[in-house]
Amino acid sequence: MGIFVCRNSLRMLNVRWLYHRCLSLYNSNHGFNEAKIKEKLAQFTGGSVDLSKMDNGIAEICINNPSRMNAFTGTMMIELEERISDLENWKNGKGLIVYGAENTFCSGSDLNAVKAISNPQEGMMMCMLMQNTLTRLQRLPLISVALIQGKALGGGAELCTACDFRLMTEGSEIRFVHKQMGLVPGWGGAARLIHLIGSRHALKLLSGALRVHPENALELGLADNILLGTEDGFLSEAENWIMPYIKGPSDVSRAVKKVIISGREQKLEDALRTEKEIFGTVWGGLANLQALAKGTKHK
Ligand SMILES: CCC(=O)SCCNC(=O)CCNC(=O)[C@H](O)C(C)(C)COP(=O)(O)OP(=O)(O)OC[C@H]1O[C@@H](n2cnc3c(N)ncnc32)[C@H](O)[C@@H]1OP(=O)(O)O
């Protein structure tokens, strides 16, 4: 019995490991040494990445390092990866809101860590970790929203592009400040920005390190809405905003996000095949049968 349990747990661990390997971009075949870069990043402490999962199927991730305008320390990069793993295993989840503590989003990577990891090899290794994590965030079967209050700078601007939607509050800004730091985005923010607003607009934002205010972001298609409420109400406003998109049973909501991911990321023929597979998971399912039995009309 003990051996059986042990073997089963090992199989589960293997499946989980393989699953993460599939969702991630980089592994040891790409020269990525995850353990080594995590060991290095663990030296840069401070702040936290907090996850709460609610009964209504919405989770919240709080980037929490307000004394440094929610900059990502090394330990926070490691924690973000752990929180995404947790969400990958949350089978009832439907939505995710990513926000920053104390009414500002995130000021990018912690400059103390940036200074200490100044050689290109370690810099690229840190990028691989963050690209893996943010790609996994983007591929979660949850509808995700970045709630941007205050500033989303550098890596903070990159983080918000990994969410499906961006809600900005009045006076907030998204700014790819990398060029002013002698850098380019490395957490996948340039590639994702081009998908969102096209290469001409992306080039302007990156080469001019332009401040993108809410109205401008809305026009560009970078933001999806501007929230006009008060500081203590923005989280619940974001929750209300996401609600119509996650209404109904989680398996259907998750299937919707999955067909979007495959349509976005795969070649047409592969995407069509994946879509058929996902369709098979909901066809004849409980929600489908209930809708048929009710004679649902769409007036
Ligand atoms: C992936 C690559 C990247 O992310 S490169 C981009 C890195 N980020 C930056 O360069 C942002 C640098 N910070 C700033 O421009 C300003 O601090 C901003 C965010 C505009 C806030 O200005 P302000 O409202 O005047 O506040 P402040 O400068 O007094 O900051 C408060 C305390 O927070 C700190 N802080 C801020 N950002 C970071 C950061 N990224 N890394 C480490 N610390 C940061 C400031 O140093 C300041 O700390 P202290 O109160 O002086 O101890």
Curated annotation (Swiss-Prot):
EC number(s) stated in the UniProt entry for this protein: 4.1.1.94
Phylogenetic lineage: Eukaryota, Metazoa, Chordata, Craniata, Vertebrata
Catalytic reaction(s) noted: (2S)-ethylmalonyl-CoA + H(+) = butanoyl-CoA + CO2; (S)-methylmalonyl-CoA + H(+) = propanoyl-CoA + CO2; (2R)-ethylmalonyl-CoA + H(+) = butanoyl-CoA + CO2
Chain segments annotated as coiled-coil in the UniProt record: none
GO terms of molecular function: carboxy-lyase activity; methyl/ethyl malonyl-CoA decarboxylase activity
PANTHER family recorded: ENOYL-COA HYDRATASE-RELATED, ETHYLMALONYL-COA DECARBOXYLASE
Keywords noted in UniProt: Cytoplasm, Lyase
Sequence similarity: Belongs to the enoyl-CoA hydratase/isomerase family.
Subcellular location: Cytoplasm, Cytosol
Function description: Decarboxylates ethylmalonyl-CoA, a potentially toxic metabolite, to form butyryl-CoA, suggesting it might be involved in metabolite proofreading. Acts preferentially on (S)-ethylmalonyl-CoA but also has some activity on the (R)-isomer. Also has methylmalonyl-CoA decarboxylase activity at lower level.
Cellular component terms (Gene Ontology): cytosol
The protein's name in its UniProt record: Ethylmalonyl-CoA decarboxylase
Pfam families (alphabetical): ECH_1 (PF00378)
Organism name: Xenopus tropicalis (Western clawed frog)
Stored InterPro entries: ClpP/crotonase-like_dom_sf, Enoyl-CoA_hyd/isom_CS, Enoyl-CoA_hydra/iso
